[in-house]
Each structure stands twice: as structure tokens, then as C-alpha cells.
């Protein structure tokens, strides 16, 4: 994972309430920006932990979700690209099946914290990928 930029580390972005991410369920999309232009990042929960990735397949630079926020295949065990069927481990972003086997999704730094409103998921941006 890319290390958070020190000046942005204190500016963590609240993504959602923790209970909005369910293991193997729908993800949350967030607009982002990188040097090459606009992007989208997404956040999911797997095995009780939140994870975040750039919404771009490692095979062809297209968004993964089937329908907006639908990243898991039917078993809820793998993330799957809707275009060519690449299968990714949700906890590592590693492609374990399909045309880009061995490649990885671009991971984000994610934390879960207690807040006055309840537990929430936060994205800690880095120097290459920031909130839009």
C-alpha cells in the first residue's frame, strides 16, 4: 500500500458508517482524482474488515462494478470485474483468476474508527490519489 501523505493523514475522508459495509455485500463508491484525471474509488467489507481500492480493473482500465456498488461475485468471496470476469481477492486485491492473474488492484489505506456519531470507515488519501 502507498503510505499516506503526512499533511493529508489528518484529513481522513469519512466514507460511511461502519454498518453500511456488510461482508460480501454492496460497496460504497467515492469520486477521486489522480494525476491523469478523474477516478472512482470503492470500499467493501470482507471477513469483518473494510478494504478500499481504485475502481479500475488491472486487465483493462475499466470500472469493476456490475451495477453501481456491486463488486462481489455471487458467493460474496471475490471481487469480480464485470467486463472480462477477472477475479480478485478482496483482502489483497490480487487477481487470482481471469485475464490478469497475478496483477493487483490499486489498494487504499482504510481505517475504521469510533466517532461521536458511531463507528465509521475512513479513507486516508495518499499523494497519488485524493478525494475529488
Predicted segments — roles?
Residues 57, 81-84:
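Short cysteine clusters
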Residues 78:
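A short acidic, glycine-rich active-site loop
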Residues 96-102:
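C-terminal structural segments of small proteins and small subunits
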Residues 85, 94-96:
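A conserved acidic, glycine/proline-rich C-terminal tail/linker
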Residues 1-75, 89-90, 104-132:
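N-terminal pre-ligand scaffold of iron-sulfur
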Amino acid at each position: 500500500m502507498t503510505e499516506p501523505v503526512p499533511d493529508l493523514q489528518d484529513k481522513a475522508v469519512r466514507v460511511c458508517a461502519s454498518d453500511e459495509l456488510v461482508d460480501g455485500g454492496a460497496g460504497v463508491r467515492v469520486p477521486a482524482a489522480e494525476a491523469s484525471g478523474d477516478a472512482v474509488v470503492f470500499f467493501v467489507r470482507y471477513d469483518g474488515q473494510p478494504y478500499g481500492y481504485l475502481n479500475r480493473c488491472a486487465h483493462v482500465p475499466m470500472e469493476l462494478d456490475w451495477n453501481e456498488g456491486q463488486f462481489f461475485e455471487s458467493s460474496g468471496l471475490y471481487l469480480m470485474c464485470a467486463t472480462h470476469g477477472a477475479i480478485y481477492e478482496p483482502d489483497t486485491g490480487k487477481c487470482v483468476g481471469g485475464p490478469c492473474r497475478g496483477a493487483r488492484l490499486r489498494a487504499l489505506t482504510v481505517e475504521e474508527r469510533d466517532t461521536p456519531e458511531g463507528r465509521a470507515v475512513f479513507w486516508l488519501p495518499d499523494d497519488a490519489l485524493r478525494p475529488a
